[in-house]
């Protein structure tokens, strides 16, 4: 993408990108969308690798392709204050090569999509339907570009649009972030003088309060479903709704009071969320809808639009441009078309609702174009990310994550003590012990017949493996955290008490006052109850690489009930994808057993072995991060005891000899409440989680409407 404009390393020392680059990317994406547009532009049928669906599904998919790219066009138009270089019909030819300007192109599309007799008419808005989601994208676009597009439409077209949008009134939707969709539509109808339901708006804003957990974070519906929807939904739509209702429905004091509340939450959110991005621009690979990619930067732009400087303007642009470049430099938008995947096409991170146009929710990441060109977010010198300034350790109390980054490799890890996801599904995108900006969760058969299941504690029992039944409690602390969860081992209930703390391996070598750049070592402990006859497996981070992954295993039979002098250990090493011309970035993942203690059985009856399971997630495709994948894990034979205490070390980014060096200086003993740890003159406790307020196997997601 650098071909659009020379890099500006003076103003943008980290990314070289300026507003000009962002505009060029937007024009490239919009030009590509036009190639797949219907004759009157109301449908965009991006190519699909899968089989064709029903006619109704195809119509919805094409609406999605239109709506999400229309949002980008509206942001481009508004960011240019309605000015189309070359005149109304020429469009920004110098950047995007448009044959028809944005206003003319989309005026025709809006007419064709809503006229009753049009053969390009969009699907009706009905209960729990995808068209309502896409209608919200259209509403966002109409709102942002209102002075130049909506206001210029013939009254007939505005009436048709309002009639189509009115179909959402009184309808059911998913009881999660989707409650914001109908509310936003109703707010737009209110703002433009059409029939609407004010109570639906109020009900949606009231509903999301049920899910607010602090630090600016919301659960995506009932339970503990934390993910990037906080960034591109919960920290976006409330502000849009308030803007639409300015002078409607709410008194000035009420609107300002709500805005202060949402601003406070947004400030808290971006303060913590900025720590979830690696130095290479990668967001944390956790949660669903990862194919929306740079949509994750929307709240940083929204903060600037709202005058919130918790994250400085210079860091905002460095972060946002870094994320955008991360994906574009790795092939996410070949020929201007966003693929279904992460860097490129890859089905492993997709959900059933993803269609060819889905990735274009990334358009929300272009909110920064609404800022004037002379805004500090576009003119200030780029400032480094937190992980570029030293090792970081941050507690996000809302989702209950301990976030730690290492300056040496620029990788950020999120240790999970609160995200749980779907209650009835063992979803790796939500229920792993840890996530990172350089690894992706895996749950796939290995090439040797084993299982690739990263960052987990699970049990082999009978002919299968255990299923997570959900978190019962958890807390993130300044140096780690604790959680309690249940496992279903072939119908048997197993309770797992888990805790971890993070050590800086090289921290003691730092000069006084210097920034730590040391390797981050996780000391993990677990107490498993109800495991007689089961075979525990403890896995580390999965490494993905486009080159074959190296594996190594050491010391398969350590001593029991004491720290092993030569612990069982396993390591895998691969190479991260880098920008074109960059050298491959080496990345290793290692685990090492520190000690195991059994209750009510002779220790010599337990067998241990360390195994690096090497395999691809899917034949020929690997993971979203590489063609090959592997993870290190510790496997136990059948346990002769009903309770086992295990302590092990985990590291991402270092070789196994680092773990051995850490273990030499480590002393750990068990207590009824957890474990006591001493390491190089420091003392820590790793407490078990005492309170278990969360219900395992909660009800599935419900539907919502105000009635």
Predicted regions and their residues:
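Aromatic-lined, polymer-binding surfaces characteristic
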Residues: 62-63, 67, 71-80, 99-301
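Low-complexity, glycine/alanine/valine/leucine- and proline-rich hydrophobic stretches
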Residues: 386-387, 391-476, 481
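Structured alpha-helical bundle/scaffold domains in large eukaryotic membrane-trafficking regulators
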Residues: 81, 85, 150, 249, ...
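Amphipathic alpha-helical scaffolding segments
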Residues: 207, 321, 542-545
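Extended repeat-based interaction scaffolds and adjacent low-complexity, acidic/S/T/P-biased segments
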Residues: 441, 448-707
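Low-complexity, Ser/Thr/Pro/Gly-enriched N-terminal "stalk/linker" regions
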Residues: 1-64, 101-109
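Carbohydrate-active enzyme catalytic cores, enriched for enzymes
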Residues: 117-122, 254-255, 278-423
């Amino acid at each position: 993408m650098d071909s659009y404009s020379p890099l500006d390393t003076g103003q943008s020392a980290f990314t070289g990108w300026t507003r000009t680059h962002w505009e060029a990317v937007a024009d490239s994406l919009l030009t590509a969308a036009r190639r797949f547009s219907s004759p009157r532009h109301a449908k965009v049928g991006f190519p699909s690798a899968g089989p064709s669906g029903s006619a109704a599904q195809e119509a919805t998919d094409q609406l999605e392709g239109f709506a999400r790219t229309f949002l980008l066009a509206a942001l481009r138009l508004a960011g240019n204050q309605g000015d189309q270089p070359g005149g109304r019909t020429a469009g920004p030819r110098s950047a995007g090569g448009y044959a028809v300007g944005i206003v003319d192109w989309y005026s025709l599309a809006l007419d064709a999509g809503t006229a009753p007799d049009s053969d390009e008419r969009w699907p009706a808005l009905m209960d729990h339907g995808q068209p309502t989601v896409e209608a919200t994208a259209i509403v966002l676009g109409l709102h942002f570009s209102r002075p130049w597009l909506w206001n210029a439409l013939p009254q007939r077209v505005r009436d048709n649009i309002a009639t189509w949008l009115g179909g959402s009134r009184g309808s059911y939707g998913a009881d999660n972030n989707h409650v914001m969709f109908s509310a936003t539509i109703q707010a737009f109808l209110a703002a433009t003088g059409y029939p609407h339901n004010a109570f639906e708006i109020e009900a949606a804003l009231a509903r999301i309060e049920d899910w607010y957990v602090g630090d600016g974070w919301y659960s995506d519906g009932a339970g503990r479903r934390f993910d990037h929807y906080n960034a591109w939904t919960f920290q976006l739509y409330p502000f849009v709704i308030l803007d639409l209702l300015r002078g409607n429905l709410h008194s000035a004091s009420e609107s300002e009071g709500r805005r202060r509340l949402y601003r406070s939450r947004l400030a808290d959110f971006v303060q913590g969320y900025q720590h979830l991005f690696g130095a290479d621009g990668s967001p944390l690979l956790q949660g669903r809808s990862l194919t929306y990619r740079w949509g994750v930067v929307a709240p940083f732009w929204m903060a600037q639009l709202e005058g919130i400087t918790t994250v400085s303007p210079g860091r905002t642009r460095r972060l946002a441009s870094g994320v955008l470049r991360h994906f574009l430099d790795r092939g996410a938008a070949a020929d201007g078309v966003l693929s279904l995947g992460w860097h490129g096409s890859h089905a492993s991170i997709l959900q059933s609702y993803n269609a060819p146009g889905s990735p274009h929710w990334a358009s929300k990441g272009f909110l920064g174009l609404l800022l004037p060109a002379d805004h500090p977010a576009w003119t200030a010198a780029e400032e480094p990310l937190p992980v570029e300034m030293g090792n970081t350790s941050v507690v996000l109390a809302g989702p209950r994550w301990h976030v730690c980054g290492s300056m040496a490799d620029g990788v950020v890890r999120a240790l999970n003590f609160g995200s749980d996801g779907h209650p009835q599904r063992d979803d790796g995108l939500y229920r792993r012990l840890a996530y990172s900006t350089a690894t992706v969760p895996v749950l796939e058969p290995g090439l040797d017949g084993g299982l690739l299941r990263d960052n987990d504690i699970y049990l082999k029992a009978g002919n299968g493996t255990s299923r997570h039944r959900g978190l019962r409690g958890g807390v993130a602390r300044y140096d780690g955290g604790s959680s309690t969860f249940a496992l279903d081992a072939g119908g048997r209930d197993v309770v797992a008490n888990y805790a971890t703390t993070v050590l800086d391996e090289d921290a003691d070598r730092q000069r006084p006052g210097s920034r730590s750049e040391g390797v981050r070592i996780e000391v993990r402990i677990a107490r498993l109850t109800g495991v007689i006859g089961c075979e525990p497996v403890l896995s580390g981070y999965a490494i993905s690489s486009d080159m074959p992954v190296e594996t190594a295993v050491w010391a398969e039979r350590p001593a029991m009930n004491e720290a092993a002098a030569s612990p069982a250990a396993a390591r895998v090493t691969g190479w991260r994808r880098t920008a074109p011309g960059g050298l491959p970035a080496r990345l290793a993942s290692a685990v090492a057993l520190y000690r195991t203690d059994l209750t009510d059985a002779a220790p010599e009856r337990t067998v241990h072995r360390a195994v690096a399971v090497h395999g691809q997630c899917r034949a020929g495709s690997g993971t979203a991060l590489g063609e090959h994948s592997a993870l290190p894990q510790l496997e136990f034979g059948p346990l002769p005891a009903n309770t086992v205490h295990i302590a092990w070390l985990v590291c991402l980014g270092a070789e196994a000899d680092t773990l051995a060096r850490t273990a030499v200086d480590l002393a750990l003993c068990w207590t009824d409440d957890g474990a006591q740890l001493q390491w190089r003159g420091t003392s820590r406790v790793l407490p078990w989680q005492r309170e278990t307020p969360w219900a395992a196997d909660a009800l599935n997601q419900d539907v919502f409407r105000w009635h």
